A protein has these predicted regions:
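N-terminal subdomain of lithium-sensitive/metallo-dependent phosphomonoesterases centered on the IMPase/IPPase/PAP
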Residues: 1-109
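DPxDG-like acidic metal-binding loop motif
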Residues: 100-155
């Protein structure tokens, strides 16, 4: 069996992709491991139910929505290769590192309305190369075919 830690460097080298992309992917994976732990613990960790706040779409946030969002933001802000991020749970993008070369967009907990009935949820993410110039909303508005990487992590 090949682990992700073994696969990523080989894949990046085989396809002449920058090592920094692997680092950003690893940051997403590390955050998802933490989110998975919270999802599995559920009621035992006291993380089920409403958070008492809403997101930008006007949806009621679940406690796990907020936790997953905070975990992903912290993990990505810690990576110097991340220039900025955009989350479904935030009003606007979050700038990270001026010299970073990647943007990460995500829904931290897709399907969170399913949490209380024990149906699968997940994290959707997309990694884009940051365009030249100052970080702006338009930086995140790129064609899907221009993604450096994307994925769905199922919990």
């Amino acid at each position: 069996m090949t682990t992700l830690a073994e696969f990523l460097p080989q894949h990046l080298q085989q396809h002449a992709l920058p090592d920094q992309l692997g680092g950003v992917l690893q940051s997403v994976v590390d955050a998802c491991v933490q989110i998975n732990r919270q999802v599995r613990l559920g009621a035992l960790a006291g993380v089920l139910g409403e958070a008492g706040s809403g997101n930008v779409q006007g949806e009621d946030q679940k406690k796990l929505d907020v936790i997953a969002n905070d975990v992903l933001i912290a993990a990505l802000k810690a990576n110097a290769d991340v220039a900025g991020l955009a989350s479904e749970e935030e009003d606007t993008f979050v700038p990270c590192h001026e010299e970073g070369r990647y943007l990460v967009l995500f829904d931290p907990l897709d399907g969170s309305s399913n949490i209380d009935v024990n149906i699968s949820v997940g994290t959707i993410f997309s990694i884009l190369t940051k365009p030249q110039g100052a970080l702006a909303t338009e930086s995140f508005l790129q064609k899907g075919r221009d993604q450096a990487a994307s994925g769905y992590v199922l919990y």
